[in-house]
């Protein structure tokens, strides 16, 4: 099913002034891309992106003011198609009466903002990308640990929720438990959040459902977080080789993005919350340019080389 946002949603989110065509506020917006219709004002419509929000700034309005009224009306009528969601005017500029007339005839809303064109463009794009981003649901727990979004995955009963509870007690923040909704806002960003019905809730076997915000306060939860790393919990397999140095970096694919992944084997006596906490800190350290595993390997190779030269 194609996701969409209505012009009314955009108007309310950005507090835009409605100039005309209130009945057209339910028109759908299907793309986050915007159009600055400069070439269209000159009569070039071969590649007119009619399905985009049409954004007018100082340049477009000033150019149209130099046109004859009949020509101006003709161009605006050409811009008004069945797929055109809305016209948005920035800087509180005066809206050409020909645009109002053409938009009224086609029942296309004309909106106005006091913001400068560039800033308004950023706000509209960010809002539409967030609302129109593809979404999937994953079984797991998302926790904000030292500013990193850590997605904890694993089979049912492996201890994900219990680990998240311990992390919350250690001062970190819960984003979602059991069902994590992940949306891809752009090519480099995955945002995780919780379905509204289970937001701030944590299920602990033997204890039941608890409300983390009620128990630990508003500082123990957050509504969404960018996913930075995946920690996969699995029952200890004595026949499986686990990385003991940390040179190898696993990846897991979410949508079309490769996310760093750490596999942590679970068995009695291992403090999973501390291990995951340290994994997050170590990941931050790697991003800052220091890799303990690589440093150890380099020091070991230097020592071996030094001993070899001494023996020679």
Swiss-Prot record:
GO terms for biological process: regulation of carbohydrate metabolic process. GO terms for molecular function: ATP binding; magnesium ion binding; phosphorelay sensor kinase activity; protein serine/threonine kinase activity; protein serine/threonine/tyrosine kinase activity. The active site is at 139, 160, 178 (proton acceptor), 244. ATP binds at residues 154-161. Its cofactor is Mg(2+). Mg(2+) binds at residues 161, 203. Residues 265-270 are annotated as: Important for the catalytic mechanism of dephosphorylation. Its EC number is 2.7.11.-, 2.7.4.-. Catalyzes the ATP- as well as the pyrophosphate-dependent phosphorylation of a specific serine residue in HPr, a phosphocarrier protein of the phosphoenolpyruvate-dependent sugar phosphotransferase system (PTS). HprK/P also catalyzes the pyrophosphate-producing, inorganic phosphate-dependent dephosphorylation (phosphorolysis) of seryl-phosphorylated HPr (P-Ser-HPr). Homohexamer. Belongs to the HPrK/P family. The Walker A ATP-binding motif also binds Pi and PPi. This is HPr kinase/phosphorylase. It comes from Listeria innocua serovar 6a (strain ATCC BAA-680 / CLIP 11262).
């Amino acid at each position: 099913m194609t996701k969409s946002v209505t012009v009314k949603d955009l108007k309310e989110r950005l507090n835009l002034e409605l100039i005309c065509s209130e009945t057209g506020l339910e028109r759908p917006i299907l793309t986050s891309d915007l159009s600055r219709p400069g070439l269209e004002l000159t009569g070039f419509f071969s590649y007119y992106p009619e399905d985009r929000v049409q954004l007018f700034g100082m340049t477009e309005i000033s150019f149209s003011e130099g046109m004859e009224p009949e020509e101006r009306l003709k161009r605006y009528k050409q811009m008004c198609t069945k797929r055109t969601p809305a016209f948005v005017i920035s800087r509180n500029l005066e809206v050409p009466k020909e645009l109002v007339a053409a938009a009224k005839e086609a029942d296309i809303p004309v909106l106005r903002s006091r913001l400068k064109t560039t800033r308004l463009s950023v706000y509209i794009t960010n809002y539409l990308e967030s609302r129109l981003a593809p979404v999937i649901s994953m079984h797991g727990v998302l926790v904000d640990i030292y500013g990193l979004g850590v997605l904890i995955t694993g089979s049912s009963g492996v201890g994900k929720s219990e680990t998240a509870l311990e992390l919350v007690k250690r001062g970190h923040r819960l984003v979602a438990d059991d069902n994590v909704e992940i949306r891809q806002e752009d090519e480099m960003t995955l945002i995780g959040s919780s379905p509204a019905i289970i937001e701030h809730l944590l299920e602990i076997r033997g204890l039941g459902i608890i409300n983390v915000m009620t128990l630990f306060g508003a500082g123990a939860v957050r509504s969404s977080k960018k996913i930075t790393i995946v920690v996969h919990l699995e029952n200890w397999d004595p026949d499986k080789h686990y990385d003991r140095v940390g040179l190898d970096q696993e990846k897991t694919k979410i949508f079309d993005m490769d996310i760093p992944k750490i596999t942590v084997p679970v068995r009695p006596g291992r403090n999973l919350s501390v291990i995951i906490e340290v994994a997050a800190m170590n990941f931050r350290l790697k991003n800052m340019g220091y890799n303990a595993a690589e440093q150890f390997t380099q020091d070991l190779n230097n020592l071996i080389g030094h001993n070899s030269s001494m023996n020679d």
